[in-house]
């Protein structure tokens, strides 16, 4: 067997060759290639004239000496047109009911059936057996069929509660395609002179029969780690609890997991990774509503749970809460304390600043950030003389929030312990402290917990970086996952700096 990374590189080059001359169809080609390499079926939904049939024709070139069968279904299609005509000679001479299958579906590796939902019951029943068992009953004999990929297409979905649902359930990958959208791609498509029948794949990249058979065994050996299974089970439970979620059979889950194994194998990995689970969005939907629902659920899973993002934020919240508790216990030691000077016959006490507050400008830290004047405030800068006047005579006190801009009016008081307390509009208050106490405000146990959490974050980010190579996942997903991890990392770093 080729080295995993060499195999991944080869499959990437093979896909690039198949995509040549097809515009905005890279994702569809890659998923159809994955389906072909793992022996699964694909349903393409979209209007006429958007290269659905060309996608299927291209996949034939992925294999050496592959045979293709293509047919447009109508209400009048007969089994003979799909599975081959009856042998008049065998029926006449030997009384045998036998089809001549050369050139028809039973002898093709790549099959494309357009307008699939127009097929009659006789075709559908035989097709179900072909998909499920890869066998075709030809008269008295069961013949094995070589089909590696079935691509079915239509511009509509099957009607609910119809006889077509059984066949629809067998189509593991479901892709909703549209016209070419980008202006440059549209122009390139219009002026392209490429012959659709040309083989764009070098012989060195084509898959041999021996390779294909060996890969089927290798795919089954790809492991499903417990953490990845837990993510899958979480998704299954979420879908079961949502009122409008599609029904997903156990058979479909099992086939989907094999597709994830194939994704891991052809990406050069020996185990399914969380990144592979994104493929489930193309496997578990039924209609437009469930397609959007699956997109949302997978985004929640990938950006919130797959790399422990939400769990790390929950831990961070617990650490911050514990730090606040410890800081509250130590607040009397760190809080800025003024000196009471008022006599017993004074109508109100007055205060003076302690000796250590001798600078002309004083910066005092909020022990807990507050939102003041629509700003998140962590420190306030006072003019020393203005603060002394307020401590002596009361009245209005102003300070620069975070040391910037004009001095703003503050709701500030001296509490019973002679500490300065500033309050926000909801009257939530926090004590002020000298900057020198800030470094000592974070207990050692909190520092250690934050260090451990940051190390865990680095491990998760490294895991994502190592696993993100997956040909079959759109790059947009990688950007969203990276952003979610960076957000967690930034919150941890901010907590360490507070």
From Swiss-Prot:
Subcellular location: Cytoplasm
Residues annotated as binding ADP: 23, 49-54, 196
Gene3D superfamilies membership: 1.20.58.1510, 2.40.128.430, P-loop containing nucleotide triphosphate hydrolases
Keyword Chaperone: yes
Keyword annotations: ATP-binding, Chaperone, Cytoplasm, Hydrolase, Nucleotide-binding
EC number: 3.6.1.-
UniProt-recorded Gene Ontology molecular function terms: ATP binding; ATP hydrolysis activity
Gene Ontology cellular component annotations, sorted alphabetically: cytosol
Catalysed conversion reaction: ATP + H2O = ADP + phosphate + H(+)
Keyword match ATP-binding: yes
Protein function: Component of the RavA-ViaA chaperone complex, which may act on the membrane to optimize the function of some of the respiratory chains. RavA functions as an ATPase.
HAMAP family: ATPase_RavA
Family of the protein in this entry: Belongs to the RavA family.
NCBIfam families associated with the record: PRK13531.1 (NF010054)
Assembly and interaction partners: Homohexamer. Interacts with ViaA.
Protein name, per record: Regulatory ATPase RavA
Organism name: Salmonella typhimurium (strain LT2 / SGSC1412 / ATCC 700720)
The organism's taxonomic lineage, starting at the top: Bacteria, Pseudomonadati, Pseudomonadota, Gammaproteobacteria, Enterobacterales
């Amino acid at each position: 067997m080729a080295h995993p990374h060499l195999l991944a590189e080869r499959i990437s080059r093979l896909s690039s060759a198949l995509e040549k001359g097809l515009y905005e169809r890279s994702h569809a080609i890659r998923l159809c290639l994955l389906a072909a390499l793992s022996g699964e079926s694909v349903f393409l939904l979209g209007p006429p004239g958007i290269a659905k049939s060309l996608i299927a024709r291209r996949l034939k070139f992925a294999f050496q000496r592959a045979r293709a069968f293509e047919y447009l279904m109508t209400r009048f299609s007969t089994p003979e047109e799909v599975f081959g005509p009856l042998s008049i000679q065998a029926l006449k001479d030997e009384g045998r009911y036998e089809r001549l299958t050369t050139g028809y579906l039973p002898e093709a590796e790549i099959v494309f059936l357009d307008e699939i939902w127009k097929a009659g019951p006789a075709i559908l029943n035989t097709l179900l057996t072909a998909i499920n068992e890869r066998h075709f009953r030809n008269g008295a004999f069961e013949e094995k069929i070589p089909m590696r990929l079935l691509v079915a297409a239509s511009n509509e979905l099957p009607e609910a509660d119809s006889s077509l649902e059984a066949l629809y359930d067998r189509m593991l990958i479901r892709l909703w395609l549209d016209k070419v959208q980008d202006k440059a791609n549209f122009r390139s498509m219009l002026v392209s002179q490429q012959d659709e029948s040309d083989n764009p794949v070098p012989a060195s990249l084509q898959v041999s029969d021996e390779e294909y058979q060996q890969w089927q065994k290798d795919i089954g050996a790809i492991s499903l780690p417990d953490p990845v299974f837990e993510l899958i089970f979480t998704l299954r439970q979420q879908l079961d609890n949502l009122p409008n979620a599609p029904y997903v059979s156990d058979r479909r889950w099992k086939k989907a997991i094999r597709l994830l194994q194939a994704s891991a194998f052809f990406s050069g990995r020996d185990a399914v990774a969380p990144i592979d689970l994104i493929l489930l969005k193309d496997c578990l939907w039924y209609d437009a509503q469930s397609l959007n629902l699956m997109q949302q659920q997978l985004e929640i899973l990938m950006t919130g749970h797959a790399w422990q993002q939400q769990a790390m934020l929950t831990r961070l919240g617990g650490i911050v809460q514990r730090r606040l508790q410890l800081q509250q216990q130590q607040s009397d030691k760190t809080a800025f304390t003024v000196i009471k000077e008022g006599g017993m016959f004074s109508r109100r006490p007055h205060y003076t600043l302690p000796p250590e507050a001798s600078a002309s400008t004083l910066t005092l830290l909020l022990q807990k950030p507050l939102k003041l004047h629509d700003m998140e405030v962590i420190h306030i800068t006072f003019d020393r003389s203005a603060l002394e006047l307020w401590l002596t005579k009361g009245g209005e006190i102003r300070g620069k929030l975070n040391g910037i801009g004009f001095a703003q009016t503050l709701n500030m008081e001296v509490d019973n312990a002679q500490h300065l307390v500033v309050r926000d509009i909801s009257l939530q208050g926090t004590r002020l402290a000298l900057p020198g106490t800030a470094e000592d405000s974070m207990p050692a146990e909190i520092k250690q917990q934050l260090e451990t959490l940051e190390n865990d974050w680095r491990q998760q980010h490294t895991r994502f970086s190592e696993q993100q190579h997956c040909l079959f996942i759109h790059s947009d997903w990688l950007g969203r996952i990276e952003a979610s991890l960076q957000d967690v990392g930034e919150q941890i770093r901010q907590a360490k700096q507070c």
